[in-house]
Amino acid sequence: NPGDSFNLIFYIENLSPWPSANSVYLNLTSDNIGIEILNNNQYVDIIESDSIYDNLLNPFEIIVSQDIEVGLYDFNLNINSSNQDQSYNKDFEISIPVTLFQSGYPYDTNSQVSSSPLAIDLDDDGSLEVIFGDYAGLIHVLSADGSSWNENLFPYDTGEQIWSSPAAADIDLDGLVDFVIASKNKHLYGFDQNGLKFDYDADQFLIGTPAIGNIDSDDELEVVIGGYTSSGDVFAVNADGTDVDNFPVQINEKIWKGVALHDFNGDGLDEIIVTTDGDDLIARVDGSGSVETLLIADDKFRSSPSIVKSGNDYVIMAGSYDDRMYAISSSGEMVFEIEAGDKVNSSASFVDLDGMVYAFFGSDNGLLHAVDLNGGDLAGWPQEIGGSIDNSVSFADLDGDGSPEAMIGVAGQLYAFHMDGSLYNYFPIPYEFSFTSTPLIADIDQDGDLEIISGSAGALVSVDVMEAGTIGSYWSQDRGNNQKTGYYEVTESECSSPLLGDVNCDALVDILDVLMIVNTIINESAITDYQAWASDLNQDQIIDILDILMIVNTIIN
């Protein structure tokens, strides 16, 4: 990576029957600006015939400039030796890539990863695990370094393609975070750190992402997902894998993508917003099983609905194959619609810019849009980036300057834009395979900078931004949060620069914040919404010892 240093080790074989090589000189050079070789000359007294020499104990030390461009860089190793009346002189050319890839990545799957990754502390050790599925039908759980986590449990083979992203929360309130994911084998799976908790057979293709919310009156959470068959059931599943009362609800519509959840009427229960791939509906389903049609479009929906609340107003957005992005109220009145010029597969993602909410989405004509809640364009947008845009945007403040960036993968390019539409340094980043999932932005290795993690047609890719950034309260992953509810709320924050772990909002994460979290846990004291958010470092909606471990680890490292 730019700014890194590394050791370069060579293995030099002197083949038999050639004689021993005496007085061997090694000279490593590079003509590239930004590459500094600290010890470019080495001397070897002798390399015996039929033996191999290596410079493990004296490697070439190389420093890469922080300002170097990403790309391939050439080195030349000259080997010069003499033996009695014979001499040997040969140049060997090698190329070393300078990339922004995180150590341990790309993680090769040999199959497409449409599942947007999830990062949670699954095993309560203060470190994040990365969870995703692939087209080979495997559910992967990786440690932060890209190695497989608990190979006795994962990867878990479902036997059929996985298009779904995982969702996570402590569904059964047992103190352990759970995650759920669906497979095209018609099953919904629930796991915790100990392995499989339930296997729900929907008897319908499940290709959308499950969402976790509160659908009934008990304390535990429920999982909601739609089926992709002609009957198009909406399923609500309890923590033990049984059906919630009044579910499944048959709406006779195929559901291609995930649902959105929110409690619109303040009764403590979430309503379900679905989009359909048949009669082209945006519909609302409540816990009683009743279905209300909010909008009928002119063509199918293959994007998830997204919900934003600004002030007292709700806006539901979804893109259609009739080339429009629709924005409606919670009761179905049209707020605005955008003529996108081509099919809209991309779901809306939201960002708050100084109290003004903007929705980002793409269309198949290669335009990436950013509009306010009246349908007006953000200055500098739309951006034409080419290729069909099937994925959605994620946001984070990559460089810690207080302003977010927008990230998305399209074809074989990973983009990061400033809010004025200009590109972030080093971006777009090319990759050999097309990017096929919405990116997750997280500090998975907890080194203070952020990683952009996304699925591709053959691997899971993680790009290390290498600047001190923050995800804050941004829409930084598929569907906006770990529970995949597709809901975003703009509220006046008592903290002007929100930062996970900075409970007292002094722009520092330190022992004072640890003490505040400890006090909250021990005394169950009342805290503000911001303090609750900043204390919940693993974003599992529970403030507990796991959050203390994570904040202590952040401070130490």
Regions found by a protein language model. Name each.
Residues L15-P19, D124, E524-T528:
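Extracellular acidic loop/turn motifs
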Residues G3-W18:
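Short beta-strand elements of extracellular/lumenal beta-sandwich folds
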Residues F60-I96:
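Terminal connector regions
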